[in-house]
UniProtKB/Swiss-Prot annotation:
Alphabetized GO MF terms: 2 iron, 2 sulfur cluster binding; metal ion binding; oxidoreductase activity; quinone binding
Species the sequence originates in: Salmonella typhimurium (strain LT2 / SGSC1412 / ATCC 700720)
Broad enzyme group: translocase
The entry's keywords: 2Fe-2S, Iron, Iron-sulfur, Metal-binding, NAD, Quinone, Translocase, Ubiquinone
Listed GO biological process terms: respiratory electron transport chain
Protein name, as recorded: NADH-quinone oxidoreductase subunit E
InterPro entries named in the record: NuoE-like, NuoE_dom, NuoE_N, Thioredoxin-like_sf
Cofactor: [2Fe-2S] cluster
Length: 166
């Protein structure tokens, strides 16, 4: 099987809008591999995650090996390779947030959501993911829900914060 050929068991097709957006991005770069991160973001924005079949479809549009696209997809923690909840919670577990008490935040999240890191709530509302650093070290402990950064967190603030995200 050719490296870019998609296995027959995984039927996947980019939408016309996804294909057009990826083609548009491709022309902004001298090397089409450079467009792979943008292509992955395009698919994720439409689907919520990047299924295996999308890797092959993106590689086909960009004219590069699927292994190159997979390498980019697995390098960046913001690209989801499995389904996630409607809201993704990323709590910082760096050394600085450790010092400022992320463990209490993690425990409060686990208790309120009834899940462990890497899991999604039964109703599909939240996925809980640890992350190395959110780049907001002077305001720890920190976490992000979707694109919203929350700083100077306390375990007591977690229930009310979660209620904002339906």
């Amino acid at each position: 099987m050719h490296e870019n050929q998609q296995p027959q068991t995984e039927a996947f097709e980019l939408s016309a809008a996804e294909r057009e957006a990826i083609e548009h991005e491709k022309h902004h770069y001298e090397d089409p591999r450079a467009a792979s991160i943008e292509a992955l973001k395009i698919v994720q924005k439409q689907r919520g995650w990047v299924p295996d079949g999308a890797i092959y479809a993106i590689a086909d549009v960009l004219g590069i090996p699927a292994s190159d696209v997979e390498g980019v997809a697995t390098f960046y923690s913001q690209i989801f390779r499995q389904p996630v909840g409607r809201h993704v919670i990323r709590y910082c577990d760096s050394v600085v947030c450790h010092i400022t008490g992320y463990q209490g935040i993690q425990a409060a999240l686990e208790k309120n959501l009834n899940i462990k890191p890497g899991q999604t709530t039964f109703d599909g509302r939240f996925t809980l993911l640890p992350t190395c650093c959110l780049g907001n070290c002077d305001k720890g402990p920190n976490m992000m829900i979707d694109e919203d950064t929350h700083s100077h967190l306390t375990p007591e603030a977690i229930p009310e914060l979660l209620e904002r995200y339906k």
